[in-house]
């Protein structure tokens, strides 16, 4: 039985162009009679003769009409006739607004839409730092900088994923293919890339680590922090593999307090006048960095070495309290990080000034390089899971106290858990270690696309799966096992308690939106684990392997959203009640499984996986070509979320065909709804199928995917034009300034989650809005799309010089290897291994990045 649907709203009339004039046919003030078509305008002499001619005695038709109206209507415009008319209008208004309110077509057209309250899918760029941040560092080892302020509260604000246009979204999710082309789909995504880096030979860093090791009574391996010059070549490899498809590179770097006066030498003398103004006015005298060139020279000689006597006491206090010192790679020239700067070699101004006629596409779309210190990314949410903002004083006090415990950090897992707070980060990100390298050309779609989602590279060995419980002997594990177990324990409290696959040692694809969801969902555990300065500390339940948590969270959120779409949004709205399963739902389930009148005694149903064409050879390439996007180049795809959920991993020797069938026990899966024919709340059935009896939910997904045919997921969705009215504002609630995108509860456990439509729409739709629930579900699912894939990748633990030679020969002899990971586990021949590594790096990626100090404007340019 189809659900009741409100009639669709008519599209609003197109407003006229406010810039049109009476001479434009599109203008409401245009008079055709004033400019007869095809008649030439009279000459000036003709105009003069017309003006001088006597007026014609005949009256115009319009004047006759006005005269007749005045003669017949004016006698009736008296108080005796107007008063009843006004009273009748007032009475109608009172009845309409207070007694029997009814919807008006004009009101419906002017009603605000949720889309008008969504934030942009693009995260805003960060503000400029105080001082000229485009200057190079005075000392290549360290950089004096003014940290960016914390994100504006409330933070994090969930932003929508890049949705396909509505007509493309409907075709894609319902039919598994789309007629939309490049014009409708828009430009291809670009990617951001992130790296963590530390120089373990820096004496300031070593002294700090030694001090905190003694305080915390821990001993961490030195090899975790050794520098082999990997970072610069890892960045070169990404530039070579994805030319023209990268937006921003992000470096996350260690930092220290500003020691005055020792660190005064690290402040560029040219910015002192501007800093004096800022310090004297409490920071209110800031100017844009480009104005520094016009700043007055308030010091005697800006090229001389700064001394405490050459700056004011207020500036000295300002530097001590607000500035910090950044540890930097010595090869990094900070003046060539931003292609939007006219002085950048790849800026169009510089290119034209050099007399070049055309620019290589890789240089025309060259990425920006941003840096962020640990101080700038270590923040905690300023909102709760329901979007309520904390009081300002309480928030600042809490964060400051937490930072005292968390920083400085020597724990890469703690730092990685803050990646989503990077200023100016895009939504789609490749997260790399500095010892990860791309060896072959890649497309953006090898990592992410709006059509198929993020690409995950799982390990498919049953014995490598991650356990779902915290083990006490791994809480202070110097490796990653403790962080993996803790991450799966968190997931198993929120989702089904189960083993989950490990992932390959390759760059990870994460989205900032999902990172923000995790930061809210598991905020207590992540806030505590981030205070573990070393992995060996015994705080809480251990580290959290954030990249693995985000990868597995995507898989679980997709499954949860699929089941919610069918259980709550589809089956729960069949009878128009919007919140329960009833007799109409039972009829729909019987129809799904092909029941007849003689099948009332059926208790169990065997479901078989149907044939699917989503990943058939050539289909994906055709879809990307149609969209005008580049198809994957270096990836083999094993599973698409557009085919449901990933089958579980099997032990060695088990029959793979068992993953192609399952049994639905109707009594066990549906409980009293089936055994006693009782109505139940759809939100309760959601928990039963998704979490209490997860095998029931998994089997229902297989049945619905099969019912959808060879492509698409049409069987999950409610019928077209099914609309649900969002709840009105509650007493004391404020009208939302912005709306988060469609998403399900962010509670840390499933028991406390409320999956009812009214609760979900109360935070993701406008009060009283008529929500197209079918499109809503498709947008919800867009957020969590994924592909399981594999690439030809190698991961090696460097042991000795002889081992390094064998590794490099093996890679050179196999051109199919697309991703390489190399871990420093050197036991002997350290200097020789380091020499071999750097020789091979330079042989493999000789072209320097533009931000390297010894970049050559001739030798290191791109050529067709």
Curated annotation (Swiss-Prot):
Residues 1-47 are annotated as: Disordered. Its cofactor is Mn(2+). It is a single-pass type I membrane protein. Residues 1-81 are cytoplasmic. It comes from the Eukaryota. Glycans are attached at residues 199, 301. The chain crosses the membrane at residues 82-102. It is found in: Golgi apparatus membrane. Residues 1-14 have a biased composition (Pro residues). GO terms for cellular component: Golgi apparatus; Golgi membrane. One of its GO terms (biological process) is D-xylose metabolic process. GO terms for molecular function: glycosyltransferase activity; UDP-N-acetylglucosamine-lysosomal-enzyme N-acetylglucosaminephosphotransferase activity. Its EC number is 2.7.8.32. The keyword Lyase does not apply. Xylosylphosphotransferase that is specific for UDP-xylose as a donor and mannose as an acceptor to form a xylose-alpha-1-phosphate-6-mannose linkage. Functions in the O-glycosylation of proteins en route through the secretory pathway. Belongs to the XPT1 family. This is 3-O-alpha-D-mannopyranosyl-alpha-D-mannopyranose xylosylphosphotransferase. The lineage of its organism: Eukaryota, Fungi, Dikarya, Basidiomycota, Agaricomycotina.
